[in-house]
Amino acid sequence: MVRILNFFEINENASDQENIISAPYDVYIPLMREKYEQIKLGRYDKTEYPENFPQQYRTGRGIAYFSEMVYEAFRGGLFNQFIVEGQQGAGKSSFALWVARAIYGNWHDALKHVVIDPFQLRQIILVAEANSITIPLIVVDDAGLFFSKGLAYRRQTGRMQTIQRLLQVIRTAVSNIILTTPNEEELSGIVIRQPKQYKIIIEKQNELVSKARVYEEEIQPLRGKKITRRLKLRDDIEKNLRTPLDFLEVAQNAHEVNLPRHIDDTAYQIYMKLRGLYTAIALRTS
């Protein structure tokens, strides 16, 4: 048995119906109730730029846009699903962790809301419902490993049947969920055919900065067709506009914002320890 963050317990000898990663959510989630209530009151980190992040002209407000979206859904009793896609090293996981840190106020609590083994979702749902708690945000990192199209269409038993059902009921316990994946098309229809969701495409700009292009995806009720629209984010910079070209730039690129590519060193080391378990978990679920 291995422990990470004095929270995640790793059982590499778990049976087909047991968690490979487990955590004391039955203790932790009730203890977080007060913090969740404070978040609902708007007491979360509204920092426009992370510490030491270069404040380049027209970068937008970065992480603050997304923490506001998470907060608004949580306060209003709504559900948001964010699909974050991009190549390896683009900054998908950094983005998800920065948003979690903004909501929870520190890296320690942010990391405790990251899901590596999808069976963790089952734990979270059961504990949240038993305690009548709604969790503001959960991050499912590298979701393509467990919610892929191929796994969904294969006849699966035990573990995979459970995994494929989890996202259908997650909104009963969680207000916002961020799923990272190299490509949205890898995910099963159970995941991507939500009535409404946000798609965020991350690209590496340089060693410090990533660019996010943000879209709103909606399924038409009658035709079942997916409609994708650019999500205008950077309306707050219009006060800086001076020429017609400036206004054109906003119209074309207001759905783009710059984001930090790096997280805190200690948080990164903990995160990489969790990432190191992917292979063992993936082999168990294939």
UniProtKB/Swiss-Prot annotation:
Domain of life: Viruses
Organism: Acidianus two-tailed virus (ATV)
Protein's name in the database: Uncharacterized protein ORF286
InterPro entries associated with the record: P-loop_NTPase
